[in-house]
Amino acid sequence: AVYKREKYIDYMNSRITDYLVQANELVLPIADERLIGGLFHVVNDIERIGDHAENFADSAKTRLEWGIDFSDKAKRQLQEMTEKAVMILEYSLEMFKNRNYKHMAEILRLEDEIDELEKKLQNSHVKRLTKNKCTPKAGMLFSDTVSGLERVGDHATNIAFAILEPADSTDDDDDE
């Protein structure tokens, strides 16, 4: 289901981006131009979240194939981080839908918590490795998952910012 959904997200990303490019070529009020600029970022962030979901599915398949099981503590840590990333995404999508600041403080708090949690989990992962409580393969999968969850939190936070403070489309970046 994850792979099918990611393929659909990629398809929709392409279609929506094409539409936004066409809309951006029209003579529009500045506010609409800025909104379109913000939407480009939202579409990209959603696509990147889909990529991370696919990476998580790949990691889960690899864990099964290699017979790797995380410790209960590692599972709890990943669960906590996952819940925070999902909350940010839910809040950001609600803000996107309603175009309000309702959850911004909570998003920023959760984003800070995720950033701190990533540092803490990566450090505890290194300690488990050095004490032989974790195999290098399991450690690699754990570390990649932690990093991916932190990036999901970043992309979800970007969605809230992009819709509330759209990019200034008056900047010409023709040489990029």
Regions found by a protein language model. Name each.
Residues 1-176:
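Cytosolic, long alpha-helical scaffolding segments
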